[in-house]
Amino acid sequence: MAQTYKVAVELSTEATLQLFKLEGYVIALTRTLDNVYRIAINNFPIEGELDYYVHCTGWNKTTWSLKISLDDKDITPDPIRGVIEKGYSAVRGSIKF
């Protein structure tokens, strides 16, 4: 049975976020004036490791970085970063905690 957590996500970029997924669920992030997409979700079910998927579009060489926190603790191992190439950047991965 999955344990539930408070999940906070921050995606910093000047690119356009096309799709963000956690554990296979499409998650809508809100873009703020400081070019950061954010969301906080209470009681999010996770089993063992947290799977994520990020797809951004924009100008080539535009960078993005992802930060994920569980129960107010940053679990992002090394910085999760990407760079737009050929108009897009898509990254999939998982975090063990």
Where are these regions (language model features)?
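Short beta-strand segments within Ig-like beta-sandwich modules, predominantly Fibronectin type-III
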Residues: 27-35
